[in-house]
């Protein structure tokens, strides 16, 4: 809802307007999405009449999205990308009590004794970010990449546990809440029963069901699914202060937000271990799926001192339970050819349920792994889901063998193009199809790869679409993708109607391809399918060089100097660029209008060009991510290790051993005030003045 310009409107009238808008929007949502009517027609009409009269009396109150200016039934989810007010971090994992103890020991080293621990079951659901302004739910966003997610506000509002308005005392002006959307197991069973009855495939597990239900374009579909939600943290906020995590949970519950009834605060690691053990034994007694226990330092001041890494808070950890294991029959071993030519064997299994999912295939990684595991086609094998996610064959049940089993023989030629397979290097454990230019499998996988969220994120470009475009001959390879036209798609049955015109799905593909031309350079680099270059390396290259042209002109030594890149990735980039048709892909994309350079913010001075900065300890004015970004945006290199090549070490509270090492090596040490001066003025701003000569 747009902000109302109060002007000369009396506060009583403004508050009544806000109340009327909230009631009408709630009634519309219930009617058009939930198919329920909390108000009679007469009551609803009376509210609208009062709102219109109030806006006639005070025109300043009338906004473009007021109920008097909009049609009631226009509720749809477009999945637009939205920035999180505060980044959604992940959690580091512990898979044993030893790893949990090591984490607790690090906490004690950093903050001393006295930390208390909040324990809660780790829900296996879909992370969600809710934003409330003046107590009113204004946005619901999926986690996405932690910085940005998809707007699913209308869908979230259908979830039974999500309050549209916070109630109670001291509701904050602004509140970002983190939680998990999931299914109770009985709700999941009911959904699947309905799908089977309707002749549709059931969901594999409750988490997939939750994700699929929340990402419906029509929120009326989401409203039919019995989704639940629990909150487990807060992000950005104004008007809410708390000293403990458990105290924050109490406030959230008092305002009407659902928190877990199983949260427990304990004083010792032994009590944490007991909590973990209890839910490990009773995980299937919980009404929803859990895959571990989350342990957090309860005291907020200690959380601040501990800080965060680039991906996870240091004051929290997820203890992951051992994955479930089952036995089933290994029906066959087949191979898959990936986008870089890697040939990977996979197991074809008698379908079996493990960790809540039905598994029919599992990875075997490579031929050496098949030999190491000792599995034969026809074996009874032990299957688990590593991390409760990726199916994996552990090995055979040897005593169940009948003698009819047979060994798997790795093919010597590509199953898709017939090219002889080979190791790319003598020490390469994988065999590859060297026909990267025209192998149908590699072409298909590379085109499909561009659809991924880590690359160009192109909707309507699934694996079937990639295959159809190549089979129809409208593209020769990924280089042609961004020049597709409607005339091209007329020749692709997948994208045409019975009348021979381009379908809505085809038009959506073209629109998506057009929109995705304007992407950060790192996404373009990922999209090129250069071996070893994933999002992390691509970001480092984009930060270091800024443009594709600069990368093309760089030597292997230049590329290896980018932080986190090194000689292996540098060699892969140089080798890739040495291939003519690879450079043709870059040329085609450039000519099609794909952005090949990042625009640098010229307003930020490049005061740290060529400098390596280490920040250690907690700073009052910067989070760790903010300090790193401040260094990178000014041309510097942010490092986590102190060496003779370090230019400056910035020391905050609880700095630890890095400050001592800096002094031993003679590296200049700055406090936070010095860091700010360095950012603004460069090395000259923090240089010690020479002593003035004595007099007399």
Curated annotation (Swiss-Prot):
GO biological process: DNA repair; DNA replication
Gene Ontology, cellular component aspect: cytosol
Binding sites annotated in the UniProt record for Zn(2+): 414, 417, 433, 439
Protein name per UniProt: DNA ligase
SMART domains xref list: BRCT, LIGANc
Cofactor: Mg(2+); Mn(2+)
Entries under InterPro entries matching the protein: BRCT_dom, BRCT_dom_sf, DisA/LigA_HHH, DNA_ligase, DNA_ligase_AS, DNA_ligase_CS, DNAligase_adenylation, DNAligase_N
Catalytic residues in the record: 122 (n6-amp-lysine intermediate)
UniProt keyword annotation of Manganese present: yes
Reactions catalysed: NAD(+) + (deoxyribonucleotide)n-3'-hydroxyl + 5'-phospho-(deoxyribonucleotide)m = (deoxyribonucleotide)n+m + AMP + beta-nicotinamide D-nucleotide
Amino-acid positions noted as binding NAD(+) in the UniProt annotation, renumbered to this chain: 41-45, 90-91, 120, 143, 180, 296, 320
Keyword terms, alphabetized: DNA damage, DNA repair, DNA replication, Ligase, Magnesium, Manganese, Metal-binding, NAD, Zinc
Boundaries of every BRCT domain copy: 603-692
Family of the protein in this entry: Belongs to the NAD-dependent DNA ligase family. LigA subfamily.
Function: DNA ligase that catalyzes the formation of phosphodiester linkages between 5'-phosphoryl and 3'-hydroxyl groups in double-stranded DNA using NAD as a coenzyme and as the energy source for the reaction. It is essential for DNA replication and repair of damaged DNA.
GO MF terms held by the record: DNA ligase (NAD+) activity; metal ion binding
Manganese is among the record's keywords: yes
HAMAP family noted in UniProt: DNA_ligase_A
SUPFAM superfamilies: BRCT domain (SSF52113), DNA ligase/mRNA capping enzyme, catalytic domain (SSF56091), Nucleic acid-binding proteins (SSF50249), RuvA domain 2-like (SSF47781)
Organism: Kineococcus radiotolerans (strain ATCC BAA-149 / DSM 14245 / SRS30216)
Annotated PROSITE patterns: BRCT, DNA_LIGASE_N1, DNA_LIGASE_N2
One Pfam family recorded for the sequence: BRCT
EC number: 6.5.1.2
Signal peptide region: none
């Amino acid at each position: 809802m747009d902000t109302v310009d109060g002007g000369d409107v009396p506060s009583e009238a403004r508050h009544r307007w806000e109340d009327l808008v909230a009631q009408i929007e709630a009634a519309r949502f219930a009617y058009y999405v939930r198919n329920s009517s909390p108000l009679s027609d007469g009551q609803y009409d009376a509210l609208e009449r009062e709102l219109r009269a109030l806006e006639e009396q005070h025109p300043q109150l009338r906004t473009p999205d007021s109920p008097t200016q909009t049609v009631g039934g226009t509720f749809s989810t477009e999945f637009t990308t939205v920035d999180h007010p505060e980044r959604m971090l992940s959690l580091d994992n512990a898979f044993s009590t030893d790893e949990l103890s090591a984490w607790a020991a690090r906490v004690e080293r950093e903050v001393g004794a006295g930390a208390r621990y909040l324990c809660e079951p780790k829900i296996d659901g879909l992370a969600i970010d809710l934003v409330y302004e003046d107590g009113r739910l204004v946005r619901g966003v999926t986690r996405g990449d932690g910085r940005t997610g998809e707007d699913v506000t209308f869908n979230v509002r259908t979830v039974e546990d999500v309050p549209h308005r916070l109630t109670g005392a001291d509701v904050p002006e602004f509140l970002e809440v983190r939680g998990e959307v999931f299914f109770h197991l009985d709700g999941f069973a009911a959904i699947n029963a309905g799908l089977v009855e309707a002749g549709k495939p059931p969901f594999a597990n409750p988490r997939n069901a939750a994700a699929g239900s929340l990402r419906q374009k029509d929120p009326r579909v989401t409203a039919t699914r019995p989704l639940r939600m629990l909150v487990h943290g807060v992000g950005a906020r104004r008007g809410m202060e708390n000293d403990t995590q458990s105290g924050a949970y109490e406030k959230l519950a008092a305002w009407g937000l659902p928190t877990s009834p199983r949260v427990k605060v304990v004083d010792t690691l032994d009590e944490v271990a007991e909590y973990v053990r209890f839910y490990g034994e009773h995980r299937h007694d919980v009404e929803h799926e859990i895959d571990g226990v989350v342990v957090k330092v309860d005291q907020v001041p200690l959380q601040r001192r501990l800080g965060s890494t680039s991906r996870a808070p240091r004051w929290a950890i997820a203890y992951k339970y051992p994955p479930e294991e089952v036995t089933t029959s290994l029906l066959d071993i087949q191979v898959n050819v990936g986008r870089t030519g890697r040939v990977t064997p996979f197991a074809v299994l008698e379908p079996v349920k493990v960790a809540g999912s039905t598994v029919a295939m599992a990875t075997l990684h490579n031929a050496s792994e098949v030999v190491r595991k000792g599995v034969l086609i026809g074996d009874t094998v032990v299957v688990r889901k590593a991390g409760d996610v990726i199916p994996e064959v552990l090995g055979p049940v040897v005593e169940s063998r009948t003698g009819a089993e047979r060994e798997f023989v790795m093919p010597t030629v590509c199953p898709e193009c017939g090219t002889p397979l080979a190791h790319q290097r003598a020490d390469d454990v994988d065999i590859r199809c060297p026909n990267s230019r025209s192998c149908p499998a590699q072409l298909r996988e590379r085109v499909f790869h561009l659809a991924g969220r880590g690359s160009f994120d192109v909707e309507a470009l699934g694996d079937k679409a990639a295959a159809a475009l190549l089979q129809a001959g409208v593209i020769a390879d990924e280089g042609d993708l961004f020049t597709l036209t409607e005339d091209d798609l007329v020749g692709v049955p997948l994208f045409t109607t019975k009348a021979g015109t381009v379908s809505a799905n085809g038009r959506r593909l073209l629109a998506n391809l057009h929109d995705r031309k304007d992407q950060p350079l790192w996404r373009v680099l990922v999209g090129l399918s250069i071996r070893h270059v994933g999002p992390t390396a691509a970001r480092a290259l984009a930060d270091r060089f800024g443009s594709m042209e600069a990368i093309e002109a760089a030597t292997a030594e230049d590329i290896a100097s980018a932080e986190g890149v090194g000689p292996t990735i540098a060699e892969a980039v140089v080798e890739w660029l040495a291939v003519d048709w690879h450079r043709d892909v870059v040329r085609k994309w450039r000519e099609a209008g794909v952005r090949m350079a990042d625009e640098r913010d010229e307003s930020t001075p490049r005061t740290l060009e060529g400098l390596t900065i280490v920040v250690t300890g907690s700073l009052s004015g910067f989070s760790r991510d903010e300090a790193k970004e401040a260094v990178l945006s000014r041309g510097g290199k942010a490092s986590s290790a102190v060496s003779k090549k370090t230019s400056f070490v910035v020391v905050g509270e609880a700095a630890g051993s890095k400050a001592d090492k800096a002094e031993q090596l003679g590296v200049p040490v700055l406090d936070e005030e010095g860091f700010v001066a360095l950012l603004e003025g460069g090395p000259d701003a923090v240089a010690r003045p020479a002593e003035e000569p004595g007099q007399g």
